[in-house]
UniProtKB/Swiss-Prot annotation:
This is 3-hydroxyacyl-[acyl-carrier-protein] dehydratase FabZ. GO terms for biological process: fatty acid biosynthetic process; lipid A biosynthetic process. Signal peptide: none annotated. One of its GO terms (molecular function) is (3R)-hydroxyacyl-[acyl-carrier-protein] dehydratase activity. Its main location: cytoplasm. Its EC number is 4.2.1.59. The gene is fabZ. It is found in: Cytoplasm.
Length: 147
């Protein structure tokens, strides 16, 4: 059971540029701009990637788990006070590990925490994704502001 969202789908769309089928954050449970965010991604069988990954045994692709974590991280960096406005893009990953498969019906709980910000252009977050309290993916994600 999850708590009430602090940001709903409409509010998330106002903060992130992603749209269907690439909007991977369904609701935000905690959000402290410039510090941390906790969000939910509900994994459903009707998502387009499951048509081919894999038809007889659908698994959420690891790159989409990482992208979901990056979108939650983006909520931290893009909403920081006193930063120049612009588009923050995913710039790199370090130490990403996958611990178990994610399947339709799972609910990803994604937690991100800001580790560093350099020259008001480059951010790094620590990210973890869990399903029912079990770690499924973790790593550090980097962001860069593009003009």
């Amino acid at each position: 059971m999850t708590s009430q969202p602090v940001l709903n789908a409409e509010q998330i769309m106002g903060l992130l540029p992603h749209r269907y089928p690439f909007a991977l954050v369904d609701r935000v449970l905690e959000h402290v701009p410039g510090e941390k965010a906790v969000a939910i991604k509900n994994v459903t069988l009707n998502e387009p990637q499951f048509q081919g990954h894999f038809p007889d045994r659908p698994l959420m692709p690891g790159v989409l788990i990482v992208e979901a974590m990056a979108q939650v991280g983006g909520l931290i960096v893009t909403q920081m006070p006193d930063l120049p406005k612009g588009l923050f893009v995913f710039a790199g990953i370090d130490g990403v590990r996958f611990r178990r498969p994610v399947v339709p019906g799972d609910q990803l709980r994604i937690s991100c925490e800001l580790l560093s910000l350099k020259r008001q252009r480059f951010g790094k977050v620590k990210a973890e994704a869990t399903v029912e309290g079990q770690l499924v993916c973790s790593g550090e994600l980097m962001f860069s502001l593009v003009d």
